[in-house]
Every structure is written in structure tokens, then in C-alpha cells.
Amino acid sequence: EFPWYDIEISGKGNFEDCRFPPCHSAWDKYDQIVDLADKYGLETIARLSSTPEWARTKVTGTFAPPDNYSDFADYAVAVVERYRGRVRYFQIWNEPNGNAEWGDQPVDPEGYTRLLCETYTRLKAVDPDIVVLAAALTPTNEVTGDNLNEFVYLQRMYDAGAAECFDIMSVQGYGLWSGPTDHRLNPITVNYSRHVYLRDIMVRNGDEHKAIWISEMNWNAVPPDSGLPPNYGQATLKQQARWAPLAYERAQKEWPWIGVINFWFFKRADDSEKNRTWYYFRMAEPDFTLMPVYEAMKAYIAAHPYSKAP
């Protein structure tokens, strides 16, 4: 993520970070990320989201949408201009169909579509060669308004004109309680196959030519004796190590519309979040102690030649 609140911190057009004197460029961290990606031949997907305090007076929290979508588009343009020719892929927001990532207020598919379309138009004017990903939608069966089922949300995006405003669709690929070979298709079942319903909606709206990328994929290996609730399903470390490679294998064999699958995540900076269930998606501990899933994915990658994203 290239979070807005960490780049344009204290006011519009101010890219200085003075939170911890002496002041320095807020771009420094992200310049280093892009430099390292270049050095090691890696592609970067820059997720653009997380509103700074000065840009959100109506709703609190960094995940709230901005008061003015044009401010967000200006920040996105600044990122694209700075890394033109070096970063090609940009994801606009994350999980806007869940109120936790929309300012803890009722979600707004039409509002998100306006944000997406304004940003898409501005970015393509700067660099028509970039690739814009729509936000990954979180799987949910709720239709309360606070959280909105991703199938309903995506159709409302299309109804609001989103088809012209993204190049690739993003989804979340969590299996929760079942493995990657779970072929059940039930609109109220959250499993690794669930995105097929979103694919059907895309086809129905004339977007069969667009790829789907999985923004986050993994199984949660929270220890049974941790006392933590299995909010994201539960797998053993051995199951996690077996299932992650199978997730890539199944997508390659069965779903030609799937492109990139992002494993979430490698490691945290420290162990201060070990009391949070989501910590146990990790591939490595903060001290770089490797989990079995790391070795499993390393072996799988070694056996499957790398192919560059389109």
C-alpha cells in the first residue's frame, strides 16, 4: 500500500513528513520500495487508499473516504507521476463493501464508483499505459447497508457506470474453513470458489475480456490453544503449507480469467500483534523464522516458471 495519509500528510500538496523531526520527504520510504523492486526485478501493485485527517472532516478514521474525491485523484496522480515507467499497476481502495474500510458508515457502491471513475480518468490522462485495478471486494452475505454482499455491490457498481473505469477486477481469495479444492458453489458459502459468482456478474455486464486478480489469498493458522477466536477460519500449519500451492495450481488449471494471486502476507514488523487472529496468516515470524508454508511456496515457485503479468 502507498497510503495517502503517509504521503500527503499534513495538508494538500505537502509531501514533507515532520511527524518525527527533522523533516524529510514523505516519498523516501516509497522511493526505497520502488528502488528495491527494480533491483530485484519485481513488479509492484500500488494500492492507493487511506485518507489523511485533513481530507476527511465528515467521517473519522483513515479508512474513511475523502470529503472531495478530486483530492484523492490528485494524490493518485502524484504517485503515478513520480513512479511513471516504474510502477504500472494501481489498485484503487480496498474492500469498500465493508464498512470497516469505508469509515465505519453505511457503504456506498455508487460513491465508490464515482471515486474510481474520477481517479481512473485522471490517471489514464497522465499515463495511458498504466493498469488500474478496482478495489478487492470482501466476501460477505450481509445486505444491511453497513456491509453489503459483494455480488450486489458489484452489480450496483456496473449500474453506476464502473465498466469504463477499471482494467482488472480484484477479489479476495480466502478459503476460511475449507481447502482450495472445495468446488461447492453456494452464494452463501465463503470458500475459494466464491469469486466465480463475481466472474458471472462481469460476463453478464460485458466484461468477460477483463481478468480477475486475487488481492489476498491464504488460510489462517491461528493455534488452537491461543485462546483467539477463529474469525478467518482455521487451518493447521501443515494444512496451510499444503493448501497455498494448491490454490495457485487450481487457478491455473480451472480459471483462465485469473491472473495474479497475492499471498497475504509475508511478515509483520514485530510481534506486538500476536494477540490478533489475523497475525497467523504470516509466512514468517518477525525475526524471519520461516513457517512451513514458506518452504512449500518456495518449492512450488521453483517448479513453475515465472511468467510476467500482462
Feature locations, PLM:
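Core-facing hydrophobic residues within beta-strands of well-ordered domains
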Residues: 86-87, 166, 209, 258
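Substrate-binding cleft and catalytic face of glycoside hydrolase catalytic domains
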Residues: 1-146, 176, 219-224, 267-269, ...
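Noncatalytic carbohydrate-binding groove/subsite architecture in carbohydrate-active enzymes
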Residues: 69, 73, 107-238, 272, ...
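Aromatic-rich peripheral "rim/lid" segments of glycoside hydrolase catalytic domains that contact
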Residues: 12-17, 21, 82, 91, ...
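Non-transmembrane alpha-helical segments in soluble domains
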Residues: 34, 76-80, 120, 124, ...
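Structural motif
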Residues: 81-88, 160-161, 204-205, 252-256
